[in-house]
Curated annotation (Swiss-Prot):
It comes from Homo sapiens (Human). Residues 695-706 have a biased composition (Polar residues). The keyword Cell inner membrane does not apply. This is Zinc finger MYM-type protein 6. Residues 665-733 are annotated as: Disordered.
Amino acid sequence: MKEPLDGECGKAVVPQQELLDKIKEEPDNAQEYGCVQQPKTQESKLKIGGVSSVNERPIAQQLNPGFQLSFASSGPSVLLPSVPAVAIKVFCSGCKKMLYKGQTAYHKTGSTQLFCSTRCITRHSSPACLPPPPKKTCTNCSKDILNPKDVITTRFENSYPSKDFCSQSCLSSYELKKKPVVTIYTKSISTKCSMCQKNADTRFEVKYQNVVHGLCSDACFSKFHSTNNLTMNCCENCGSYCYSSSGPCQSQKVFSSTSVTAYKQNSAQIPPYALGKSLRPSAEMIETTNDSGKTELFCSINCLSAYRVKTVTSSGVQVSCHSCKTSAIPQYHLAMSNGTIYSFCSSSCVVAFQNVFSKPKGTNSSAVPLSQGQVVVSPPSSRSAVSIGGGNTSAVSPSSIRGSAAASLQPLAEQSQQVALTHTVVKLKCQHCNHLFATKPELLFYKGKMFLFCGKNCSDEYKKKNKVVAMCDYCKLQKIIKETVRFSGVDKPFCSEVCKFLSARDFGERWGNYCKMCSYCSQTSPNLVENRLEGKLEEFCCEDCMSKFTVLFYQMAKCDGCKRQGKLSESIKWRGNIKHFCNLFCVLEFCHQQIMNDCLPQNKVNISKAKTAVTELPSARTDTTPVITSVMSLAKIPATLSTGNTNSVLKGAVTKEAAKIIQDESTQEDAMKFPSSQSSQPSRLLKNKGISCKPVTQTKATSCKPHTQHKECQTDLPMPNEKNDAELDSPPSKKKRLGFFQTYDTEYLKVGFIICPGSKESSPRPQCVICGEILSSENMKPANLSHHLKTKHSELENKPVDFFEQKSLEMECQNSSLKKCLLVEKSLVKASYLIAFQTAASKKPFSIAEELIKPYLVEMCSEVLGSSAGDKMKTIPLSNVTIQHRIDELSADIEDQLIQKVRESKWFALQIDESSEISNITLLLCYIRFIDYDCRDVKEELLFCIEMPTQITGFEIFELINKYIDSKSLNWKHCVGLCTDGAASMTGRYSGLKAKIQEVAMNTAAFTHCFIHRERLVAEKLSPCLHKILLQSAQILSFIKSNALNSRMLTILCEEMGSEHVSLPLHAEVRWISRGRMLKRLFELRHEIEIFLSQKHSDLAKYFHDEEWVGKLAYLSDIFSLINELNLSLQGTLTTFFNLCNKIDVFKRKLKMWLKRTQENDYDMFPSFSEFSNSSGLNMTDITRIIFEHLEGLSQVFSDCFPPEQDLRSGNLWIIHPFMNHQNNNLTDFEEEKLTELSSDLGLQALFKSVSVTQFWINAKTSYPELHERAMKFLLPFSTVYLCDAAFSALTESKQKNLLGSGPALRLAVTSLIPRIEKLVKEKE
């Protein structure tokens, strides 16, 4: 065996020459590219999943009314079939390295195996007598690898044995599974942090190398991430981060187009939204494998389709149209249900394909070719269609549709082919690997130079190799920068995705809802400029970004590469500025030209640019993009009526910013299409029909529906039936008189007139510089202007031009000063509202704004921004009275929002409580619980806070509440629940609040005695001997805490003895939880307190000498600690009757279990008492009897306070378990049938596992309104008065109790709604 000579090299590689010829980085022509995009499944099994176009304008009006597209939301993890590979790779049979095209290959005589060198042939040659190698199993899919050449052996870190894989996709999938899984906790779970080794609540949980690491904070998470060099998985299209939810999730893999379609139909989960890059559960991520074997993740089906469409569009090569088979650059794309992409050259081909695709078997679709590029398609249900020109009815087969579309697009295809042949693909050179590439480059701007890379990996490697480091904005460490993000006008570098995500989250929490992302430059900023474009509200950081985005939106911008105007589909950030381009060709040409200019000396740059301008070829975009001049609306025109208008156009909504640009556009192409018979007619201003119509676009997560609007055509061709068509669509309108306006001349200033600043350029209006009067556009004539000067300002008739110029400058200065003053005033008022809102939310006195915030704000701005900024801060109105007025207005706005939401909710529940603990003022608080359909959940808000007289009855309380309910136009019949603390004035049988509300609510409201108050009443039931121990403990505590000297001396004594605690809590009867804490601390410090009381010669020291007394104290500390845990579990927001009843039942069963253990002398459930009894000679006979009697009485009192007959769960368990079979349901026969249907709904069953019970029933309203209403009437009522108690605690914390008690400031302190400050500021103007 020897190495072949140069002449024999061709013979050596003959067996696989065909394979080597196919190794290419990208397709060379349209035929190869079209072969790549051919789907593997039959069209009969596919569904169109999404429509997109280069022009990003909807073609819904062109599609069949009976044909609708639908997108499913992201759901479980899905493995979709990827786009077929573009090239076939050949590997060395020995070392498994890939053989590149043109590389010398070696093989044995009589064998087809290829090797990269003679060493590989020698090393891997084996005698025939050796036994066959053992079979290997793929580590990922566990399948046997039959062909040894397919084995890929890889050794991972921290793993000694190597692992085998059957393909590159299995290797990529295995590496993806080994990546760390991040779980974000929303509930506090106390564990030991893996980084700081502190016991704290777990914020993140990372499963890495089969070990679960708990992390307590963002700092520990970032440190763990950088220490282990981890990366977070994210969507390839939108960049949403992947994390695992805290609950159980189930992964599902789909391998066929049928499974994909079923998955999309059953998945109905709405993805969450967050600032910047959002978070997506890993169960919702879709896993695919590209042609190179790399595993890619997507957060939804929409992102997968959009990513593939973007890949096809950015390639810039010609593709065979799926309808007419013409090779052209694709202008429209259809995302099918199996993940494949169909490309089309025009909208006519899309309509033709849709008609053939959606036509049922055995039905002939009707289509009549009207003119070039136009086909009218009837709905599938219709049997025939009438031609627009008034001809006979004709039926056209799918083949004829394709034929007519191909014939109409033949001239366009020839032009596009000629232009495409002259286009040569420019390839760039990667700065790291020195490979040539023709894809969108990865850019790096460093030290005043631009660096181009073929991908993200090369960019990262270049940064590491050349130490491109900077200080990370989040972790404040000098590291290699991964990405730079712009926040509020400042570029912030980040060393990792985690730091960027945490910084964005902190930025969003700091600014709240005032923080928005600019639609143009993608920077996050609290500044907000809004503009509505074709019904969609866009937000921008400044006016400049809004104007640039508007020009891009209406396709009026020019390409930065070829300088042609039109749709710009590509953009890059070059030297800090955003550049826009037609397609990938222009991007590559621009980057190549800029790099060449940077390499040349300065005196040669202009020459190079001049040559480029001369030799630059026309862009393929302008020549190949058809101007759609006729689009038919298929929604409102009946099939049997003849419209007679063959050039009807759907008029798109164009804003004022683009109207001027549209009118000034050239219309030479349309003028050339006029018949010769009409050439004698005078030229008229034509409208750009390419802007008026709306081509196909991809709408995310919505179906592509036919446009239902049909309006009169904008055309200059006389139509025979134009009058009839106008009468059919809209009533006749009056003819408008054509106005001939004269343009402004500078000579008009001699008579004292200038152009009014607010007038339109198409019809300017003159304004007098003396009196400021504005005349109409028709008066823009010298005679009329001179007449105004002679009649009204005759004394100034002979003044020179300089006089009127001076008056003009004075008027301009006045207008600019007034505008600037109004702008500043608006910003100052907004700042005043923001400070007032934060003052009330922080429960601070109103005077703090003027006394503390304003002086420091002036000093800071003067020091940082200059004295002018400090002077501006002084003008912010922040007086005590102003802040109070601002708070009243903010509270009124929140109250208006609340009442509106309650009216939309229909059903609501109330929580009422009164208190007189604060400044001897009796306050009545009322909270309301309602359904917020905006966020699809239940909300709780403060309804009102009213000051009451000291002595008031239940009837008077009802009058106050009823007066407020009537003033807000709320209906008592919609009240489904009322919760109180059980006071006599609230629950009176005849004259109490309960009786009055039952009277007006027609017995529809369910009344609930607060669970926490009932639990407190149960805890107060003690035997006389135990109650005596409690009183004596309080006496000891009062002796120590009543004297400051005694407290200090006890603290010193505890510190000297090394005690864990050095002080005692203060006991109060009104504080329920303080009783358990006081007894526990008293027992823990019993030795220190005994020594202290003995030194003080107090008689109270004798109690600690009695072991039986100490044993009873230990038992009381244990039992009250357990009761405190139950009390805390009953507190919180959004609690339901079902949750609290379950917790009460659990405690009842624990009491029975403790009684059984007490009889067996087992006291492990009482740790303090068990420890003391084991370490002392305590006589257990008497104390066991006391404990048993107390537990038995406690169990009885719980049963009396929570009787089974008042348990609303009986017959209503279907609400919290709708997918389980229940014997007794309080439902009608119709509701039982609906519940059976709901239990079989797989979509709702998947939703039930991921949302709360209330959210589930709110989402089920559309499909099951009866069950929704029945369930919400049991879920809305309050079970506790916790919110009222929390509001009273907020009043206690405030320094301005008398002001907070008035209501507005208290509402801002406890509300979760955001006031509409922009609306309030506009009302001030």
